[in-house]
Amino acid sequence: MCIRDRYYTWNEIIKNDICDAMKAYGHEVKLLSYEIKSYIKDIEFLNIVENELNNGRNCGKPYDFIFSCNFMPVISKIALRNKIPYVSWTYDSPCMTMYSEMIYNPYNFMFHFDSSEVERIRKSGVKHIYHLPLAVNVRRTDAQIRACADNVSPALINKGVAFMGNLYNNEPDFVESVAGLPDYEKGYINGIKLAQLTMPGSELLEEMFDDALCDRLKKYVSFSKEEEFFVKDTDMILNMLKKNISSMERIGILRELSEVCDVTLYTQSSGCDMRGVRVREYIDYERDMPVMFANSAINLNVTLRNIRTGIPLRALDIMGAGGFLLTNYCPELNEYMTEGKDFVSYIDAGDCCEKAVYYIEHEAERKKIAANGHDRILDMFTYEHQIKKMFDVIRKEL
C-alpha cells in the first residue's frame, strides 16, 4: 500500500533531500508551497489544505500524513479538525512555535533534533515528541563533489579555515535596545555575557539570569505574544541574549584565527569586514556548499548558543561532504561519534587557533579524520536512515 504524504514546504533548504528520502521509502509525496500569513491562524491556508484532503478522500486516495519542517500550530489545527496525523521535524532552535498550546494535539508526531528540547517538552506532558538528529543526502553531495573534482571554482577552495554562517551582528543588542535600562542592570547583563564567553561549556547565562532579574527588566521592556503561546518572558530574553553572545563568539574566534592562518567567511551578514578575514557571499546550499566543504582544509562550526545539546545541521553537512570539522563542544556529537577520530573539537578561541594551525600543517591526519567523519554520516545520518526511523516510530504509535 502506498503511503501518501502532504508536505507543506516554506522552501526550507532540506526540502528536496527529505522528499527524495520519503520517495525512496515508498511514499507518494505531494508538495504544497504557500506563504502562510500566520503560523497560528490562516483561514485561506486552512481552506486550501482541507479542500485537498477532502479531494483525496473523495477520489479514493486519502492522505495518510501531513508533514512539515518545523512545527506549525496552524497545520496542527488542520490535523486535529480532520483527524489526520501531522508529522513535523524541527531543525531550528529556538523554534518558538514549540511553545504553542497546540503541541498537546494528540494527532501530532513531533520530531526534534535537540534532545534537551525534547526533554523540556516531554516534561510538560506532551506524549508524541521524539528525538531525531538531522541528516545529509550523502548520495547527492558525493556525486556533486565527484562531478566537479577537476574544475572547482577558486572561490570554493580554501587552504586555511572556512566558516559559512550568520554572524548575527545585525541583530539588536538586548542591553542597548531597552530604553531607560539602568546602568546596574546593563552592567550585570553585560558581565554575564562576557563571563559566558570565557566559560563556553557552561550554562552560566541561564544559571544567573533568573525570574527575579526578569521581573526587574519588565519595568523597561514588554513582549507581544500570541495568547496560545506559553513562553515565559525569561526565555524570550535568554534567546535574544544567546544570539548576542553567539555573535560575539563567532566574530571573536574569526578575528583570532585570522592572526594565525588564512580565514574565509561565507555569509549573508552585512557590515562584517574584519582585518585578515576574506569575506565572500553566501553560497548555494545544494550546489556549492558541499564542494566548498570538501575543498577547504578546515571547516569551522560555532554552534548557535540557543542549541543546547543537538548536532547542528552545518556540522553534519561538513562531515557528509567529506570535509574536516573543527567545532565547539557538542554533547550529542560526542554521543554518536569519537572526538579526535571523526571530528575535532575546541575548548575556547585559543584552543581553536592551535588546532586549526596543527591540522592545516598535518594533512594526512586531517584527511583521515575527514574520511572517518564522512563514513559515520553514511552509516548513521543519511536521510534514508532518519526517515525510516521516523516512520518506524509513527507506525508503532498508530
Regions found by a protein language model. Give the residues of each.
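Short N-terminal targeting/anchoring amphipathic segment
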Residues: 7, 52-71
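Structural motif
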Residues: 64-65, 85, 109, 298, ...
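Active-site proximal beta-strand in glycosyltransferases
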Residues: 79-94, 109-112, 134, 162
